[in-house]
């Protein structure tokens, strides 16, 4: 599934969303099969979440917000479960924050519901905690992006 995700990323970078969607769908199919066969393997569960997020990104780029929300919600469900099972793993907390951010910003008209704003606040808080724990600048940058998106909604 990793190879299909990489091919999808190349197609997406070329704005070839149809090809990207095809590759990501193949990655999702493989990830689903493996995650079902090995439900206790967190890496396979994470791969499944990544595939849902990638398909959500393609749907959002095509302005299919309903489909994007569905994919993002599935990724969020998996990310929540993994972060709860392995709270000591920063990467899984980051995945949770990314899923919260994607669900929190997916909007056809740019307006966010109170639930989406809460998701953005949660994502920013998680990234803030990760930055404090690790000192990794990427987490500080992501926290700032989430906070800026919240501030845009308040204006």
Please give the residue ranges for each predicted region.
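C-terminal non-catalytic interaction modules
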Residues: 125, 129-131, 135-155
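A detector of tandem-repeat and repeat-rich interaction/domain scaffolds
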Residues: 1-129, 133-134
């Amino acid at each position: 599934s990793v190879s299909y995700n990489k091919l999808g990323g190349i197609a997406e970078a070329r704005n070839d969303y149809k090809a990207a969607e095809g590759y990501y769908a193949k990655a999702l199919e493989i990830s689903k099969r493996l995650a079902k066969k090995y439900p206790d393997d967190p890496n396979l569960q994470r791969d499944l979440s990544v595939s849902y997020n990638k398909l959500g990104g393609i749907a959002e780029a095509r302005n299919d917000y309903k489909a994007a929300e569905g994919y993002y919600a599935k990724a969020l469900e998996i990310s929540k479960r993994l972060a709860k099972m392995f709270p000591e793993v920063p990467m899984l907390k980051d995945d949770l924050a990314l899923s919260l951010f994607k669900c929190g910003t997916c909007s056809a008209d740019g307006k966010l519901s109170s639930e989406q704003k809460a998701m953005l606040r949660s994502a920013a808080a998680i990234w803030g905690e990760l930055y404090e724990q690790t000192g990794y600048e990427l987490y500080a940058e992501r926290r700032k992006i989430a906070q800026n998106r919240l501030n845009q909604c308040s204006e």
